[in-house]
Regions:
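Alpha-helical scaffold segments that flank or form the walls of functional sites
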Residues: 1-18, 36-47, 162
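Mid-to-C-terminal alpha-helical segments outside catalytic/metal-binding sites
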Residues: 218-233
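Alpha-helix-loop-beta-strand connector modules within alpha/beta enzyme cores
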Residues: 32-50, 101-115, 157-158, 162, ...
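Short, well-ordered coil/turn segments that N-cap beta-strands
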Residues: 12-15, 49-55, 80-84, 110-112, ...
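Short acidic/histidine-rich active-site segments
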Residues: 115-121, 190-205
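Active-site core of metal-dependent hydrolases
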Residues: 84-97, 102-173
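Charged helix-capping and loop-helix junction motifs
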Residues: 32-36, 69-73, 98-104, 175-184
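Divalent metal-dependent hydrolysis catalytic cores, especially in the metallo-beta-lactamase
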Residues: 3-27, 52-58, 84
């Protein structure tokens, strides 16, 4: 609830909230309980502030197949009723995409659209593998900076790329913001957007992300409009 009210103060009109429901279940809370509580809070906030939302449920790389599948099945009843997609997040260096083929075959059987965190740790192959696994969007994707072949793959398949500048600086996925590849991605026709990743951990907002890129000369104000249109698309 608080999260949606906070982003509404930035004039955000639609927000996709992602989290890992498995981290909230316990002996007294089922997946249904977790999702009902989450969606109830978001809906209360929507009625108060007018900002619309959807939830992306995250599988975690360090969870086994059985655990991740249990989450997808446990949240399936909410798909189209507040849940819009699934995701795979976590340490991609230790758990590369090559380990998750079966998970996403099962996700497709359950009719989940999905985005996948890939290319944050420096492995461009994870991006390729995520696309081949059926991802319609890539979280981060900065590893394909300078890799025109993979950028062309994203462009040709209309893959959304969800960049997160401050988070990437903090995790050392990039070293300096002035060289951040958003402009490169835009110039090469990629459907790129700017995101916060984790507002609380990174201590940022969407407004701060966009202003930081503008202040470093990475983008100009007209490109901010393009990035927002890409996010909406």
């Amino acid at each position: 609830r608080e999260f949606l009210l906070d982003v509404a103060k930035e004039n955000v009109r639609y927000m996709e909230v992602r989290f890992a429901p498995t981290c909230s279940i316990n002996a007294h809370m089922t997946y249904r309980d977790v999702m009902e509580a989450t969606l109830c809070g978001l809906e209360e906030a929507r009625k108060e502030c007018g900002t619309f939302y959807n939830v992306i449920v995250c599988c975690m790389r360090h969870f086994d197949l059985e655990t991740n599948l249990a989450m997808l099945k446990g949240c399936r009843e909410f798909l189209g009723e507040g849940v819009c997609a699934a995701d795979l997040a976590g340490d991609e260096a230790s758990w590369p995409m090559s380990r998750f083929g079966e998970l996403f075959r099962e996700a497709r059987k359950l009719d989940y659209p999905y985005t996948i965190h890939a290319g944050e740790c420096g492995s461009v192959q994870n991006i390729v593998d995520a696309i081949e696994a059926g991802a319609s969007r890539i979280g981060h994707g900065v590893a394909m900076k300078g890799c025109l072949e993979v950028q062309k793959l994203c462009r040709d398949r209309h893959i959304g790329v969800e960049t997160c500048p401050t988070s990437n600086l903090q995790t050392r996925a990039v070293t300096v913001l002035k060289d951040y590849p958003v402009r490169e991605f835009l110039n090469n026709g990629i459907l790129v957007s700017v995101n916060t990743d984790n507002r609380t951990v990174s201590g940022t907002t969407l407004t701060q992300e966009l202003l930081a890129l503008q202040n470093q000369g990475v983008i100009a104000e007209p490109e901010t409009v393009i990035l927002m249109e890409n996010a909406l698309e």
